[in-house]
A protein has these predicted regions:
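Metal-dependent phosphodiesterase/phospholipase catalytic core, i.e.
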Residues: 8, 13-117, 139, 161, ...
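C-terminal active-site rim and adjoining tail of enzyme catalytic domains
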Residues: 47-51, 121-233
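Active-site beta-loop-alpha junctions enriched in small/polar residues
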Residues: 2-4, 14-15, 76-78, 103-106, ...
Length: 233
């Protein structure tokens, strides 16, 4: 979710329209009326929806309400106080309490100060540490961790401190199964073409070595290729 130049909150992962709409301009420097001039042209089946536009956050929440879905909203950029107030107001329109995620602890802390009491996740791309745990306890946050930077010990430590763990960028079902058994509370599955990326537990390229050895409870010098997948159950 990002703020446009005229204070509209829109749903876009990227900061520009280049990848999805073919226009190399920053969302933060465009009004929403300008953004609507560029329909989405990339993505699966995009050609079947020629008038598909970058949606507003209000439209996204309305869609979630229609299908009784819990909104999960990553906050990319809120630049102004007015936009933050608008964001808080839009959250109240959701029939199910939204889950908010963000890389910036300052933004999450501000939302707590403004009265948001729902679930929030601090997105991290580094290993968990004591300072991170304390920050999460201060603002009642969970942690959203990149798969290669989380271990079973980290998950156990977080749980002991009342913190849930979300793991993202899992690339196949084997990785999902590993982190599920390690105790992850939420898992984001990046489902690719399984015929091309199908791998088992002994794949060198998919599962981080430390995570794999910890899960399998074997010495860290052991080769992944030396143990059959069935022996990891």
């Amino acid at each position: 979710m990002r703020e446009t130049a005229d204070g509209v909150l829109v749903v876009s992962h990227d900061d520009s329209l280049l990848r999805m709409c073919g226009e190399d301009r920053l969302i933060s420097e465009m009004t929403y009326e300008e953004i609507k001039q560029y329909p989405i042209i990339n993505g699966r089946n995009a050609s079947q929806y020629p008038d598909n536009l970058i949606p507003t956050l209000e439209q996204y929440i309305a869609c979630c309400n229609k299908y009784s879905v819990t909104p999960v909203i990553e906050i990319k950029s809120i630049r102004t106080e007015e936009a933050m107030n608008l964001f808080m107001q839009l959250l109240t329109e959701s029939q199910k309490e939204p889950v908010l995620i963000c890389f910036r602890i300052e933004t999450l802390g501000k939302l707590r100060e403004m009265g948001f009491t729902g679930k929030m996740q601090w997105i991290r791309t580094v290993r968990m540490n004591a300072s991170m745990i304390q920050q999460c306890k201060k603002y009642d946050l969970d942690i959203s961790a990149e798969y290669k930077n989380i271990s079973m010990n980290d998950i156990n430590n977080a749980h002991q401190n009342g913190i849930r763990i979300s793991v993202w960028l899992c690339r196949n079902e084997d990785m999902v199964d590993i982190f599920r058994k390690m105790g992850a509370d939420y898992i984001t599955y990046e489902k690719w073409n399984t015929d091309e990326v199908k791998m088992r537990y002994y794949s060198h390229s998919t599962i981080p070595r430390g995570v794999w050895h910890e899960y399998a409870k074997i010495p860290r010098h052991t080769s992944q290729n030396s143990i059959a997948a069935g022996n990891l159950e």
